[in-house]
């Protein structure tokens, strides 16, 4: 009899633990693998997880959590290449060739790690949150930090992130001489042509402000709109300051202005099943054509809400509490890459 009583007490305790810890908060339920495809961009693959640091259950009023993510092609480098092949002013100032191109390129694999805190209101109908993240691009060694704030009330979500580049970027140049041909239509060999190569890379600082909404009887749907702004996206590629003032005063340069500096991103995500969600959206930089994107996401565990095989709503807890372990929304890293290639021909006695 005593053994039976002890067994029953143990069972009740285990049941209580399961109820309070909320089985939907299993680590796998907060770990996702995703694939994103966007116009004019390389496919982006990532794995992301959010985990509470301390014990969290349905009686907790606050949570401290860590969030980590590793992404292939986890950011964009706005690249500008300037090229000029010319003669010094003293030799006539002829420009043989000049070219300027701008493009977007992947910055490669990135990693991010963040720490966050969220606290529910007294009635559990809203919560406020704050978070800090560190981002790193492994190939280019770009570094960025961010500070974010959140406010969730009912189905409505408001968030803002402020991004700060770490370091002043990198810049380098080299000047050397070599023999090479004067371009067509001259096609004449020349000697001691001065070649100047310059490179400058820097990470953008900035901010984004977003609004998202879920729906009471269709909690598997989430719509959002996000406004972003980037600083440090302007620059100039120009002739290196040669020791010869005749060359420096030639004043060839290429301005790079506001490359994808401001824009709006909007979209919708749908949990189709407890394991699979799909999303689609539109990214519209001001002054540039917009780009569509689609995203598929696989949850290692299960999402609580889903169109098929999951709940559509939940009255057992407030909406704010059910979102306490949702992932922080942030923008990918942005960078500017300026490259200059200048060839300068001097007058020579043999050509006089």
Indicate residue ranges for each PLM-predicted region.
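Extracellular loop and loop/strand-boundary signature of outer-membrane beta-barrel proteins
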Residues: 33-36, 74-76, 80-103, 133-136, ...
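Membrane-embedded beta-strand positions of outer-membrane beta-barrel proteins
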Residues: 33-35, 66-68, 98, 130-132, ...
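Outer-membrane beta-barrel channels and translocator barrels
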Residues: 54-61, 120-125, 153-156, 216-220, ...
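Transmembrane beta-strands of outer-membrane beta-barrel pores
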Residues: 35-41, 70-76, 102-104, 117-119, ...
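Short glycine/proline- and aromatic-enriched beta-strand/turn motifs that initiate or cap beta-hairpins
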Residues: 8-56, 63
